[in-house]
UniProtKB/Swiss-Prot annotation:
CDD domains recorded: Hfq
Subunit and partners: Homohexamer.
GO biological process: regulation of DNA-templated transcription; regulation of RNA stability; regulation of translation, ncRNA-mediated
Name by which UniProt lists this protein: RNA-binding protein Hfq
Biological source species: Pectobacterium atrosepticum (strain SCRI 1043 / ATCC BAA-672) (Erwinia carotovora subsp. atroseptica)
SUPFAM superfamilies noted in UniProt: Sm-like ribonucleoproteins (SSF50182)
Keyword vocabulary terms for this entry: RNA-binding, Stress response
Region ranges (Disordered): 64-99
Gene from which the chain derives: hfq
Described function: RNA chaperone that binds small regulatory RNA (sRNAs) and mRNAs to facilitate mRNA translational regulation in response to envelope stress, environmental stress and changes in metabolite concentrations. Also binds with high specificity to tRNAs.
GO cellular component: cytosol
Annotated Sm domain residues: 9-68
């Protein structure tokens, strides 16, 4: 497994396995919503009313509708997606409050 995918694969697999609804933002700003049906090194199969094959190089952000626990082979990595994201959100909120 490629080093760059040691976080990506467990995260996507947890979303797929738990059937978590996700919003996928593309680099051109388009927002796609659905559940991850499958994925490989290059694409994600997103299912809603239809199935869409989305190329990973076109994806900017994957946002789960709820926190997802996943395991990573990355030492020191976060085991909870929202755990590391919460800090950034709190810092952003604190900065907004200070203005």
């Amino acid at each position: 497994m490629a080093k760059g995918q040691s976080l990506q694969d467990p995260f996507l697999n947890a979303l797929r396995r738990e059937r978590v609804p996700v919003s996928i933002y593309l680099v051109n700003g388009i927002k796609l919503q659905g559940q991850i049906e499958s994925f490989d090194q290059f694409v994600i199969l997103l299912k809603n009313t239809v199935s869409q094959m989305v190329y990973k190089h076109a994806i900017s952000t994957v946002v789960p509708s709820r926190p997802v626990s996943h395991h990573s082979n990355n030492p020191g990595g976060s085991n909870n997606y929202h755990g590391s994201n919460t800090t950034a959100q709190q810092q952003s909120q604190d900065a907004d409050d200070a203005e």
